[in-house]
Amino acid sequence: MKKPSLFQIIIIVLSIPTTTGRTVGNLRVREGSPFKIAIFADLHFGEDTWTDWGPGQDVNSVNVMSAVLDAETPDFVVYLGDVVTANNIAIQNASLFWDKAISPTRDRGIPWATLFGNHDDASFVWPLDWLSSSGIPPLRCPAASDDDGCTFRGTTRVELIQEEIKSSNALSYSMISPKELWPSVSNYVLLVESSDHSKPPVALLYFLDSGGGSYPEVISNAQVEWFKTKSNTLNPYLRIPELIFWHIPSKAYKKVAPRLWITKPCVGSINKEKVVAQEAENGMMRVLENRSSVKAVFVGHNHGLDWCCPYKDKLWLCFARHTGYGGYGNWPRGSRILEISEMPFRIKTWIRMEDGSVHSEVNLTYD
């Protein structure tokens, strides 16, 4: 009997049931086409739902995503955290707003994955003026919410993913971490297979929960050890390119950040604020910089930054683009796009704006 190859073993390992008890298949490149990913960052659905302004922001955010999806027709979508602003959602089931944020992608039959930001499970913050003579305004709950669900209680990270998976029509690739990594929840890896079954995988996509909200903004030592074990098992010879996604930038982003203007080798269009990094560094960047297979890290969190800069001449550190009309800042909205080509292997990225324009294209593959 012929022994399976290393790549066949990797595919088998990544097809085992996840913590949620379901089996998630692998992604696959379409024959003759590159594999394209759209990143939606910082949508911040559910803000000020007791006003006319808040729901209007969500409509605008849907329009941004729809414009990007129709222009780029991606194979996959990554929701890069702060999908909702839970500290502004005055109902128990924040997943109803999470579902609204996912809907443009799901309605087009495009698979996706999500990870958490610092606002997704934050506790509800009571506006002080509600406790004055004006009183608490009537809550505007989504139609799917009953009276019991229209209360002042948050929704946990685990509950959000569980509800997402239930309503995903099998399009969600999101997973729940092993419990030993909790309270960090969105830690998992996805494999992008070649269109040719006889060829090795094209890429490994790692998703990490950078915390915030219900616990500190940090990638823990336990997560670092999980990544080391997972990556060394799946990619021991560093032959498969790896891309990393999390929400809050690491401190390494501060080291490469442009001082004022974005100049080469960095590429981007806005540099309007300082990098707001994780609270502590527990060795994740040291692990990544020592893996030649890691090509780039993608984060959100800072709405006024959209650049990519090389780090130690080994990998790229990239911000996405603020996609949602929720959250701070009035910079034009858009989405970072990734394109992975097989033959020859190449990773390109650019930013697609709501108005249809494209800018800041850069090759993330070192020759």
Swiss-Prot record:
Tissues with expression: Expressed in stems, leaves, flowers and siliques.
Keywords from the named record: Glycoprotein, Iron, Metal-binding, Secreted, Signal, Zinc
GO cellular component, one term: extracellular region
Carbohydrate-modified residues: N93, N290, N363
Cofactor(s) the protein requires to work: Fe cation; Zn(2+)
Protein residues bound to substrate: H301, N302, H303
Signal sequence interval, chain numbering: 1-21
Any one GO molecular function term: metal ion binding
Cofactor binding note of this UniProt entry: Binds 1 Fe cation per subunit. Binds 1 zinc ion per subunit.
InterPro entries listed in its UniProt record: Calcineurin-like_PHP_ApaH, Metallo-depent_PP-like, PAP14/16/28/29
Lyase in keyword set: no
Chief location of this protein within or outside the cell: secreted
SUPFAM superfamilies: Metallo-dependent phosphatases
Annotated positions binding Fe cation: H303
Subcellular location(s) per record: Secreted
Binding site for Zn(2+): H301
Record family assignment: Belongs to the metallophosphoesterase superfamily. Purple acid phosphatase family.
The protein's assembly and partners: Homodimer.
PANTHER family for the chain: METALLOPHOSPHOESTERASE DOMAIN-CONTAINING PROTEIN, PHOSPHATASE DCR2-RELATED-RELATED
Name this polypeptide is given: Probable inactive purple acid phosphatase 16
Originating species: Arabidopsis thaliana (Mouse-ear cress)
Lineage of the organism: Eukaryota, Viridiplantae, Streptophyta, Embryophyta, Tracheophyta
